[in-house]
Swiss-Prot record:
One of its GO terms (cellular component) is plasma membrane. Glycans are attached at residues 138, 196, 397, 449, 540, 779, 816, 931, 1002. Keywords: Cell adhesion, Cell membrane, Disulfide bond, Glycoprotein, GPI-anchor, Immunoglobulin domain, Lipoprotein, Membrane, Repeat, Signal. This is Contactin-5.
Length: 1099
């Protein structure tokens, strides 16, 4: 219910705002030459007040947030500048601060007919301690006890049963805590109502046809704005506005520029309150035509126009009305004198209303409307002036000052007209005094004291609005204290160094500083100085400077002291050896750091590499710090890498000083990678490359090695170069023996006496130029195929060796013993076979064959000549002695003999078979390969007559079929399973018995039975055959056995019986008829029960 209520509230609220916005956007200028300025939906400012709240009769008071310019008046200042955001206050309740507005009261329009009968003016303030609230109406504080209708919850002021006569006015919230008070903006409470029209009958208006007329609305008392419309004759027939009819949204009057006979009737003025939506109707005004003729033509007479001076706020929308009576009906036009009407402007109601949204300063100027017809024209001019609400440029910040210090606060705001400034202290006007000046937004207090502490507000206002900025002033007054700035009680330095003893006591006013050594005052000289912040500095310290130093801070509220003891020690010296060392990658070294120091001081050693501390745990065991003696330390570097080269630092730290020394370590290693590799020139088999030298890593580069990679290589391969050996001082070379028309990328590797470095970044991918192919096809062979065909096959040339585009093959062949070659072109680079067909070529004719290559650059070499025979002929002899034997219900075994041939050697045999009830051309076929002369046909139908033929085949085709033979498949095995299966288990065997299976008429006779048994959990079982309906099954191992029985016949195995589960048990006897288990003393009854009850898996 709660969520539904909130939804209804939200929809009603948005509906109210939408209707209110529509009502306002429809208002315009008046018959009385007045201007109406209404809010734009995107406007950030609305009059001189914040946007009002509206009270719904059913939902109570509704509040609309104030516009953005109003938000500038609400300042969030952190006390003594300790916080950067207002939210920080909520997180630290220990900080005390003055009041800060969270929400200020909004303007409210309260409908007099509201069912709520309650008005709430909201005010919320933060502060620590929590603020208290008071309210003012029209500048006078409200006594909550003076009227039973008043109440306050937190800071919200509530008026029950509000009355326009007693409660309308300007309200302000005053919030106070121990730091002072702040005053909110003025919020207006006004009441919305709509009275009734006078009930007096209105006189008829009689005009001549063609004459203009004005029908007066004379609205009843109302607040605030109302919206006008007119009803013609009866509701809801409304007067439609056009170039001839116009309704002024200022006076509500209806203007008809030229009356027609269709206008005769009764007119009623309908007014609607923009807030309450209440509507009332006026008495009807009859409009009649006189019978003394038609009105002649006359020039326009402007009846509605805007004022001579129009003022409007920046960002709002202005609407200017202009309408004229005349015959013919006048046309209205608009212009801006000495300028152009803004492009964003819109003309409404047949150009009678000029609407300019989102007003800007450059929209100001003189506007003119002109009414014109064939009899003449009339114009009217007025000036549009744009004003702006105050807007902050510079606000106030919370401030704390020492007593006696000067204060200067400045607030700046823009606006048109230019804003004036007023100052408030604790909610009351601040007037100039002997120490206080206020002028042009500047507040100056020449010497602050505790009475000046409090909450201050700067008020910037012009005739259209006001904004507030608030800040807190704290006056500090306290004796000197060192609690927040503690000083080291013992200071140790070395000779000839600087001593700095800080002395920064907190206090207000700022304490005066003095120093003593023992009981003698410290006087400044060339070595000793008291700095502006109170600290004592001693240069070139010596033993004579040792002792206790006392700093004293004094102000009018008291004094405080600190004592620091100074000790002067001998300076520390350090030596790091060896100073410069050259090593090779993989070697080790020890750096020794020795310190000479004051014996009363402890020393600590720190090691650095290239200015950064060495992390001994993250360096992979390369570094180890060894402390053999109190005054020395060693750095062990093992298995040195190139990255370990650089300047090593040893720093010795005592409580008095810190000294350091450095040593340089050079590491020789393999070269770094050469720079960018550039391909400068390309031919069909070479590429000229250049590169920038590699880093030699302190060992001269002896040679470079060129490597290449292509789509056909296994990774990077070293290539031959010119010169053959690329010395370390060279930066270019030529890669040779490359394959034409292949994409390559190159890299360079440098070598020095220590080793080979990392390769360079690969060059860009390049392709060598095209060339005539040089590689002939390999493995030329052939044979087989169909009769009269010569089949030639070869291994295709890899793309790597095709050497260019347009690659193909030239197939040349000639009968063995002849001289002329016949050549055929094969254009596919992937081709591996060519078939030449000639009906005159006898089977197995030998041919000499060679295969060559070509591309766009020319012809390449041929392969070696090989001899290939043409295809053999089809088999000519039919298989003999074909027999077909039925094996089972679905199988027939076929056997034949074949005759050897010289020109038609079979590759295999094809057996065709079909049912007796089907034609031969529907035959299915099975093929064999090679010299096999038998086949088992499977998947046949039982008890069915099949016809069969056999024929040989090879690549040339099929031979003649054998004579037709026939065979009938066996009848189906019995479909009835063995029934009434009985068993008796004794020891390690089980005796079975069952009822004999009797086959149906279309089933084969039972030849015997098969008993299938297996141990549970095993997939493989055993079979026992028997001709009788009984059997003995051995159970060799302990466990549970699964047993089933099938009848078998010449048609195969029949349907299986239901499975039984039999336990193998050495003691006792179990039968399938037993229903109790009491005799099984050694058998687990639970196990046996499970064995008998659980279902078994099928075979």
């Amino acid at each position: 219910m709660a969520s539904s209520w909130r939804l209804i509230l939200f929809l009603s609220f948005t509906s109210c705002l939408s209707e209110y916005s529509e009502a306002l956007s429809g208002l315009s200028t008046s018959y009385a030459a007045l201007l109406r300025i209404k809010k734009s939906s995107t406007s950030s400012a609305f009059g001189s007040k914040s946007r009002p709240r509206y009270s719904s009769p059913s939902l109570g008071t509704l509040s609309v947030s104030p516009p953005s310019w109003r938000g500038a008046a609400q300042q969030y200042h952190s006390p003594v500048n300790l916080y950067h955001s207002p939210d920080a206050f909520r997180q630290d309740e220990s900080v005390d601060y003055g009041p800060v507005f969270v929400q200020e009261p909004d303007d409210i329009i309260f409908p007099t007919d509201s069912d709520e009968k309650k008005v709430a003016l909201n005010c919320e303030v933060r502060g620590n301690p929590s603020p208290t609230y008071r309210w003012l109406r029209n500048g006078t504080e409200i006594d909550l006890e003076s009227d039973y209708r008043y109440s306050m919850i937190d800071g919200t002021f509530i008026i029950n049963n509000p009355s326009e006569s007693r409660d309308s006015g300007l309200y302000q919230c005053l919030a106070t805590n121990t730091f002072g008070s702040i005053l909110s903006r003025e919020a207006t409470l006004q009441f919305a109502y709509l009275g009734n029209f006078s009930g007096r009958t209105r006189s008829a208006v009689s005009v001549r046809e063609g004459q203009g007329v004005v029908l007066m609305c004379s609205p009843p008392p109302h607040s605030p704005e109302i919206i006008y419309s007119w009803v013609f004759n009866e509701f809801p027939s409304f007067v439609a506005e056009d170039s001839r009819r116009f309704i002024s949204q200022e006076t509500g009057n209806l203007y008809i520029s030229k009356v027609q006979t269709s206008d005769v009737g009764s007119y009623i003025c309908l007014v609607k309150n923009a807030v309450t939506n209440a509507r009332v109707l006026s008495p009807p005004t009859p409009l009649t035509l006189r019978n003394d003729g038609v009105m002649g033509e006359y020039e326009p007479k402007i009846e509605v126009h805007f004022p001579t001076t129009v003022t409007a706020a920046k960002g709002t929308t202005v609407k200017m009305e202009c309408f004229a009576l005349g015959n013919p009906v006048p046309t209205i036009t608009w212009m801006k004198v000495n300028g152009y009407i803004p492009s964003k402007s819109r003309l409404r109601k047949s150009q009678a209303v000029l609407e300019i949204p989102n007003l800007q300063l450059d929209d100001a100027g003189i506007y003119e409307c002109t009414a014109e017809n064939s009899r003449g024209k009339n114009s009217f001019r007025g000036q549009l002036q744009i004003y702006t609400y105050p807007h902050w440029v510079q606000k106030l910040n919370d401030t704390q000052l020492d007593s006696g210090s000067p204060l200067q606060w400045e607030c700046k705001a823009t606006g048109k007209p230019r804003p004036t400034y007023r100052w408030l202290k604790n909610g009351a006007p601040l007037l100039p005094q002997s120490r206080v000046d206020t002028a042009n937004g500047v507040l100056a207090i020449h010497s602050v004291n505790q009475s000046d502490a409090g909450m201050y507000q700067c008020l910037a206002e012009n005739k259209y609005g006001a904004i507030y900025a608030s800040a807190e002033l704290k006056i500090l007054a306290s004796p000197p204290s060192f609690e927040l700035n503690q000083v080291k009680k013992s200071i140790i330095v070395t000779k000839d160094r600087e001593v700095l003893i800080e002395c920064k006591p907190q206090g207000s006013p700022k304490p005066a500083i003095s120093w003593r050594k023992g009981d003698k005052a410290v006087r400044g000289n060339k070595r000793i100085a008291i700095l502006p912040d109170g600290s004592l500095r001693i240069l070139n310290a010596s033993k004579a400077d040792e002792g206790k130093y006392i700093c004293q801070g004094v102000n009018i509220f008291g004094s405080a002291e600190i004592i620091a003891s100074v000790s002067v020690k001998e300076p520390t010296r350090i030596e790091l050896t060896p100073k410069r060392t050259e090593l090779t990658v993989g070697e080790s070294i020890v750096l020794n750091c020795k310190a000479m120091h004051d014996s009363s001081l402890d020393v600590t050693f720190y090691w650095t590499l290239k200015g950064q501390p060495i992390d001994f745990e993250k360096e992979g065991g390369h570094f180890e710090s060894i402390r053999a003696q109190a005054s020395s330390a060693d750095l062990m570097i093992r298995n040195i890498l190139l990255m370990h080269a650089g300047r090593y630092g040893c720093r010795v730290q005592t409580t008095a000083d810190s000294v350091s020394d450095e040593a340089e370590l050079l590491v020789r290693g393999p070269p770094g990678p050469p720079g960018v590799v550039i391909v400068e020139e390309i031919t069909e088999s070479t590429a000229t490359l250049s590169w920038s030298p590699a880093t030699d890593n302190h060992s001269p580069i002896s040679s470079y090695n060129l490597q290449a990679r292509s789509p056909f290589s296994l990774g990077w391969q070293t290539v031959k170069t010119v010169p053959e050996v690329i010395t370390g001082d060279m930066e270019s070379a030529m890669a040779v023996d490359l394959n034409p028309w292949v994409e390559y990328e190159f890299r360079v590797v440098a070598t020095n006496p220590i080793g080979t470095g990392d390769p360079s970044i690969p060059s860009r991918m390049i392709r060598t130029n095209e060339a005539v192919p040089k590689t002939a096809p390999s493995n030329v062979s052939g044979g087989s195929g169909r009769r009269h065909e010569l089949v030639i096959a070869w291994e295709p040339v890899s793309e790597e060796f095709q050497n260019g585009e347009g690659f193909g093959y030239i197939v040349a062949f000639r009968p063995n013993g002849t001289r002329g070659w016949k050549e055929k072109m094969v254009t596919s680079s992937d081709a591996s076979k060519f078939i030449y067909r000639d009906e005159s070529v006898p089977p197995l004719t030998p041919f000499e064959v060679k295969v060559g290559v070509y591309n766009n650059k020319g012809d390449g070499p041929f392969s070696q000549i090989v001899v290939i025979c043409s295809a053999e002929g089809e088999p000519t002899a039919a298989p003999t002695d074909v027999t077909a034997t039925s094996v089972s219900v679905s199988e027939i075994f076929v056997v034949w003999k074949h005759v050897k041939e010289s020109l038609g050697r079979p590759q295999g045999f094809e057996i065709g078979y079909w049912k007796d009830t089907e034609p031969e051309d529907s035959a299915e076929t099975v093929r064999t390969r090679g010299n096999e002369s038998f086949v088992m046909l499977t998947g046949l139908e039982g008890d069915t007559l099949y016809h069969l033929t056999v024929r040989a085949y090879n690549g040339a085709g099929y031979g003649p079929p054998s004579r037709e033979v026939s065979a009938t498949t066996k009848r189906h095995p019995p479909s009835e399973p063995p029934g009434n299966l009985r068993w008796e288990q004794q020891g390690s065997q089980v005796s079975l018995g069952w009822e004999p299976v009797r086959p149906l008429a279309n089933e084969s006779e039972v030849m015997g039975y098969k008993v299938f048994y297996r141990q549970e959990g095993h997939s493989k079982g055993q079979v026992i055959e028997t001709q009788k309906p009984q059997a003995v099954v051995p159970l060799p191992e302990a466990g549970v056995y699964i047993i089933e029985v099938r009848a078998y016949s010449e048609g195969g195995d029949g349907t299986a019986s239901s499975q039984i589960r039999v336990p193998s048990y050495a003691g006792g006897k179990i039968t399938s008829a037993q229903s109790t288990l009491h005799s099984l003393s050694k058998w687990s009854s639970v196990t046996l029960l499970l064995a008998l009850m659980l279902p078994s898996s099928s075979w």
